[in-house]
Amino acid sequence: MYQRMLRCGAELGSPGGGSSGGAGGRLALLWIVPLTLSGLLGVAWGASSLGAHHIHHFHGSSKHHSVPIAIYRSPASLRGGHAGTTYIFSKGGGQITYKWPPNDRPSTRADRLAIGFSTVQKEAVLVRVDSSSGLGDYLELHIHQGKIGVKFNVGTDDIAIEESNAIINDGKYHVVRFTRSGGNATLQVDSWPVIERYPAGNNDNERLAIARQRIPYRLGRVVDEWLLDKGRQLTIFNSQATIIIGGKEQGQPFQGQLSGLYYNGLKVLNMAAENDANIAIVGNVRLVGEVPSSMTTESTATAMQSEMSTSIMETTTTLATSTARRGKPPTKEPISQTTDDILVASAECPSDDEDIDPCEPSSGGLANPTRVGGREPYPGSAEVIRESSSTTGMVVGIVAAAALCILILLYAMYKYRNRDEGSYHVDESRNYISNSAQSNGAVVKEKQPSSAKSANKNKKNKDKEYYV
């Protein structure tokens, strides 16, 4: 295309075109050169934009664990070295309480809880979730004799699960993850193997869940009472009303720091920092915002996948951690403090007849804390940052070239329309004799030829022959 334009310009500027042809050639060249430069600029800009796709690989361990459900991008507050919102509970204790609105209290068959903490206490209550008054369902994360454990009841008996191998009251930062599905439960501290708990009377829950779909709603309570008599394990945590953080109300106040609490998609500490209307703070509680960098841990950053043997549909949030071999102690390396990925999927309401209050579906997110202090994140992980400006440079260059061409074309048309119409040169030396005579002031007298002479002249003219 550029060669064709150059040929056109050359033809316009050829000698045969005269002065107007030379001007046209110059205008054509003025039009072609900016177009070429603009096109090259657009291509270069587009190439630089295409090169803006960065894939940041965080090198470390070559092990990679697949996650069975979709991963959502972590909140901005949890990227770049933050472990989530942190509160310090001083001497004397304090308490952060979240209350669900009366018409929005969820009933769940599965629960997910994750939190980071550091303390030197041997006895304390970290988090407790209670149902509405009179129901008696609860879930409690506590420290007993320096060991972390969870105790819950969803309508049958108290079920307890504890990590007895990990010492967590050493003043170092630890992360605990708890999952519940019906009466089954898993517990993991840092990178230690996942502890599982399957209570008695919970083996036929899959067939029971299928059968309950065909039981009329009015008979649901009767069936549940009959199942209780048969020793069946109930599965629904009914009408959750409050989340209590700090344990002051239970008489075992927590002293230390708590970071990044996530419960079924709720980021309670973040909400407390934002002065949420449903949260009340009492006692000696102070917002820090991040975990102190002086605290370290010897736990590895390898995520664990919790193994759930039950096949009951999980209707709340889902926690995915990578699988670890049972009986194999965790590899201990002196690395900086880390917290593990907390994966939360969208939630749905249970359709079990045991539900008391209807719940509404909620959506979760991914809490992806990284290492504190701005150091390298988890080994083997990769973050892909895609920029949407891959074609912006090309488009801008083309638009600029087109606009410049239009301006030059309009200028050329303007110059062409306003050109001179032409001038005529008159040779004064070749005037008629009559004009010369008149210019000298002499008057030429016209002679009146006689009729006879004119007749003879006409006769002679008839006899003449003309050759062309």
Curated annotation (Swiss-Prot):
Protein name, entry field: Neurexin-1-beta
Chief location of this protein within or outside the cell: membrane
Domain of life: Eukaryota
One of the record's GO cellular component terms: presynaptic membrane
Pfam family, one: Syndecan
GO biological process, one term: regulation of grooming behavior
Assembly information from the UniProt record: The cytoplasmic C-terminal region binds to CASK. Binds NLGN1, NLGN2 and NLGN3, DAG1 (alpha-dystroglycan) and alpha-latrotoxin. Binding to neuroligins is calcium-dependent, and the binding preference ranks as follow: NLGN1 > NLGN4 >> NLGN3 > NLGN2. Interacts with CBLN2 and more weakly with CBLN4. Interacts with CBLN1; interaction is CBLN1 hexamer form-dependent; CBLN1-binding is calcium-independent; isoform 1b does not interact with CBLN1. Interacts with CLSTN3.
Residues where Phosphoserine is found: S450, S451, S454
InterPro entries: ConA-like_dom_sf (IPR013320), Laminin_G (IPR001791), Neurexin-like (IPR003585), Neurexin-related_CASP (IPR050372), Syndecan/Neurexin_dom (IPR027789)
Family label: Belongs to the neurexin family.
Region described as Disordered: spans on this chain: 350-381, 435-468
Binding sites annotated in the UniProt record for Ca(2+): D137, V154, I236, N238
Membrane topology field: Single-pass type I membrane protein
Parts of the chain on the Extracellular side: 47-391
Gene name of the record: Nrxn1
Keyword annotations: Angiogenesis, Calcium, Cell adhesion, Cell membrane, Cell projection, Glycoprotein, Heparan sulfate, Membrane, Metal-binding, Phosphoprotein, Proteoglycan, Repeat, Signal, Synapse, Transmembrane, Transmembrane helix
Glycosylation sites: N184, S346
Region (Essential for interaction with CBLN1): 201-230
Tissue-level expression: Brain.
TM segment ranges: 392-414
SMART domains per record: 4.1m, LamG
